[in-house]
Amino acid sequence: MEDDYFSITSILADNHKMSCTFALDAEGLGYLEGSTENDIHEGTKVELPFWLAQTLSVNQFTTFTLPLPYSSRVQSALVASPVSVKLSNLVGGNGWWYRWGKKLADMLEDEQATNIRNMLLRAFTGRLPTLQDLAAHHASADHTMPELSTSKAEMFRDGMEGDERELFSIGQDSGRLFKAWYDRKKGSR
């Protein structure tokens, strides 16, 4: 996972909104909450993009609650059946659930950070075999045949988040290259 200042995916992962509560009065920042007031007062809740929430939280200007995509409800669903959770729905269609979760864990205290990292790891390891099988199937499938979009595999594919879609594409390309190599070797015998 790249965490580069100039990376579009890194920028997109930092753009998710977080609910923050100001821990002190902030003069001249009233525009952040869309208010006509010039200042933000202590205890005011504001939705901020992650990149700003992170900076304000690290400097103890704000506190935040854990975003819904990483809540105990989502964690329980991932434990029950990792492949049935539509990660794309949790962070938006082109969202980056793993990247945002990693960045979130990096700014949390020990126990919470460990819980988030473990959730990310369990989700990834629980979903990877299905992702790999699906990529291999799509790489070798005869795409002239109509496929059922309601199958579990297609539902999983629709629920993949950004990093999973990248891995899926790499897996498809790899499968096609292997098939082409195998067909060449088989034909030369």
From Swiss-Prot:
It is found in: Nucleus. GO terms for cellular component: GINS complex. This is DNA replication complex GINS protein PSF3. PANTHER family: DNA REPLICATION COMPLEX GINS PROTEIN PSF3. Belongs to the GINS3/PSF3 family. GO terms for biological process: mitotic DNA replication initiation. It comes from Cryptococcus neoformans var. neoformans serotype D (strain JEC21 / ATCC MYA-565). It comes from the Eukaryota. The GINS complex plays an essential role in the initiation of DNA replication. It holds the Pfam family Sld5. The keyword Manganese does not apply. InterPro entries: GINS_A, GINS_bundle-like_dom_sf, GINS_Psf3, GINS_Psf3_sf, PSF3_N. Keywords: DNA replication, Nucleus.
